[in-house]
Amino acid sequence: MLAIAGLIGCAGALATIAFRECLRQLQWWLAGADQGLVATARALPWWARLLVPTAGGLLAGLTLQYGLKWIPRKGAEDYMEAIAVGDGVLSARQSLVRSASSLCSVASGASIGREGPMVQLAAMCGSLLGRVLRHAMPVSVEHMRLLVACGAAAGITSAYNAPIAGAVFVCEIVFGAITTATLGPLLVSAVTADIIVRQFFGYGAVYAMPHFDFVSGWEVLTYLGLGLAAGMAGPLLLGLIDRARGAFARTRLPQALRLALGGLIVGALSIRVPEVWGNGYSVVNGFLHAPWLWQTVALVLVCKVGATAASAGSGAVGGVFTPTLFCGAALGLLYGTGMHALLPGAAPVPVSYAVVGMGALLAATTHAPLMSILMIFEMTLSYQVVLPLMLACITGYVTAHATGAPSVYARALARNRDDTLRLPPASSP
């Protein structure tokens, strides 16, 4: 099983690398340079900022609307559904069509993460390998689910350079428990994927973390306060996205026009705030290493939340994992700036709260505090952030859980089940 897990890790890593390269080529075609979406948006005139996300949304919607029309619905559509409640069979053709749609959305500036389709493609590799093995040997449903889970762990690792968090993500969120029977193959798959990805992109932190130290015991209380704020903000963010989905559904527009409308909203916001384009890696690194006025951070946060709700609510294929990190960083920076103004001695480095805020809001939305702690640690490669991160993540999780609001993945599973019940039989070509 471990050897098969390593093979899945290799295949999953190569699939995510191929997706990255396709995305890079699309962005190069759009801007003539590989400079990132935010830099591209800043260089465009206002009318192009409005037009590009709209056209990208329309193309993404057409890809979904007509690409899925003739595909028989065999297997689960989402990797979490295939692992948690399915038989481990993931529809390869649906995954490819949805990934193509995601390419159009992400490359044109939609406020969603590229990591969602990357994980889906890697999980698809695990499902395909399991189906091939079935012809040579008996493979139980439990083993099929584990193979898909190995692919998902490889995909998360490839997307975030976080092999430990990738394995824990699947255990904590999908399986609901960490056991030695599942953790071993997941770690092998994640480590294999990490080795391959680093051969292409090198070894380095996703977010370069500035140095900071605790200066007093009082600072612990300020991080607990940040966790409390993130725990209240998480359910509000997810609720806003759900309301946006409902609003788009009530328009009764065809799928292509809904995605185009979502792109139009993102484009309109980007005329004033181009930082809403894409997943926001460059903006978060800017939060950490450049001075920002709190008014500017607040404006960027509000517009980013609106852009994410518009993109995800319209039905664009992509994750909200990375936009959540963006919103957490902005929330943490605002909180740290306020604490520094009120208690300079207890909050000497406001940007440290940006990193901790990412983990706290992630824990509040995923209900997975251990994964959130490990994810931020591996993305920053900074041990000094772990202690305040643990405090804020646990506080954020407990606060969000106390509200009774479901996690982002529980909402997604429930939504997928409802959609499956409403779907008519597929058309024949």
Swiss-Prot record:
- Biological processes per GO annotation: response to acidic pH
Task: Give the SUPFAM superfamilies listed for this entry.
Answer: Clc chloride channel (SSF81340)
Question: What NCBIfam families does this protein map onto?
Answer: PRK01862.1
Q: Where is the signal peptide?
A: none
This one is known as Putative chloride channel protein ClcB-like
Query: What InterPro entries does the record point to?
Result: Cl-channel_core, Cl-channel_volt-gated_ClcB, ClC, ClC-type_chloride_channel
> Where is the protein localized?
Cell inner membrane
Which residue windows are transmembrane per the record? 1-21, 44-64, 146-166, 168-188, 200-220, 221-241, 259-279, 283-303, 315-335, 354-376, 383-405
Q: A single Gene Ontology molecular function, please?
A: voltage-gated chloride channel activity
According to the UniProt record, one GO cellular component term is:
plasma membrane
Which terms are listed as keywords in the entry?
Cell inner membrane, Cell membrane, Chloride, Chloride channel, Ion channel, Ion transport, Membrane, Plasmid, Transmembrane, Transmembrane helix, Transport, Voltage-gated channel
The membrane topology of this protein is: Multi-pass membrane protein
Q: Quick one: where is this thing mainly located?
A: membrane
HAMAP family from the UniProt entry: CLC_ClcB
Gene3D superfamilies (UniProt xref): Clc chloride channel
The Swiss-Prot or TrEMBL record describes its family as follows: Belongs to the chloride channel (TC 2.A.49) family. ClcB subfamily.
The protein's organism comes out as Ralstonia nicotianae (strain ATCC BAA-1114 / GMI1000)
- Short name of one Pfam family: Voltage_CLC
